């Protein structure tokens, strides 16, 4: 295993819903998550959030404060993920792009019925993005 890889996530909420993408590539292929991915060389965290959101949903955003961070440690990879609050145009509709096979606004109360990446629901609850399952 190499050293940790730095990643970002974009947490967009509106009207009791959160923006999710269905991952089109590993890790978590086929599962739903917040938009995000690896930070590229010479890229700031804010630049990475904007790029990943645009690539995966076609949406532009304003990046706010960090929601929190988590570590995902597997047999071959170690990811450190910092998630940020983002604001998107309330009338814009997400369209799945690179690394995403689908994109949707999901009501908080429905999250428990979606196939989410491991730990996402707990992260969103722990960081008070949602009040619980």
Regions found by a protein language model. Name each.
Residues 7, 33, 83-85:
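Conserved beta-strand segments that form the floor/walls of ligand-binding pockets within enzyme
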Residues 10, 66, 84-86:
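A structural signal for short, well-ordered beta-strand segments
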Residues 12, 20, 86-88, 105:
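Conserved hydrophobic "DFG−1" position in protein kinase catalytic cores
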Residues 70-93, 127:
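Active-site-adjacent beta-strand/loop module that shapes the phosphate/pyrophosphate-binding cleft
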Residues 17-55, 59:
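Conserved Nudix-box catalytic region and its N-terminal flanking loop in Nudix hydrolases
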Residues 59-68:
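A short coil-to-beta-strand element that immediately follows conserved catalytic motifs
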